[in-house]
């Protein structure tokens, strides 16, 4: 993969597909679209447009030119839709696919970054202020000194342990599989990661299904581009499909929310596959959005309160010890 393709991120991909969709809506051919890109696009878009103009002479379709520029699953959606004569619908689905996805760990990181930095900053400030008071007033061995040493020693160790545990959890989530993972998947933040993965998978399968893929083919398309964690679930789902015709029971690997899984099991033999997958994906996304909103409301405030209490304990104990020493 070239550097240009590697730097062509999700926003660039969406912008490209939206341009293509607009051109298609105005009745422009793919050749016209490629010419437009070659004449007035960004440097990356110009390369795509120029390659697209050369593609027919090389016996290629334009979608083949997009290999490496678009994510594999999105490209598969376009290829299948184009084969079925539904390119515009395929573009809609591809844009929808790129616009999906919920980075749980990223969201949690940004949710906690500022409060944790504030906690650390106020802790350092409190240690410094109390240290200056202790040194100036010769309060060694006092209550203030003991509180300061507690924060500097065990307190700092606890903070580092919590930070390390969170970092280790983030690292292990995409790769940890097996029975032990099934147990921790019920605990936070693993349960939120599982819900996000399930919602994104269901959305992708729904998009591929709407483009014309069977459930089995869609899973096989997604599998090579999945994390080790999701791959393990997909392998079990594909195994279930060997003997199971009900999509709900085929998807029953412990990945989905219990309520959503029950709905899929009941409706699997009745509802259209695409509708079934879309509704289940929406259920997972709603559940996660509600959970994240609750965490956003509570967690930062709790951390900030702890930071204020920590600063108050350090400075307050120093002032109290100073007052006692003056009285004596």
Residue ranges and their predicted role:
Residues 1-2, 41-47, 150-156, 169-172, ...:
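Short charge-dense sequence patches
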Residues 53, 60-61, 134-144, 181-185, ...:
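Low-complexity, intrinsically disordered or weakly predicted helical/coil tracts enriched
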Residues 100-172, 286-328:
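Bilayer-spanning, highly hydrophobic alpha-helical transmembrane segments
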Residues 6-105, 194-296:
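Glycine- and small-hydrophobic-enriched helix-loop-helix hairpins
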Residues 1-12, 168-197:
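Transmembrane-cytosolic junction motif
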Residues 164-167, 172-178, 220-224, 254-256:
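Short flexible/disordered coil segments
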Residues 6, 60-64, 149-156, 160, ...:
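N-proximal short alpha-helices
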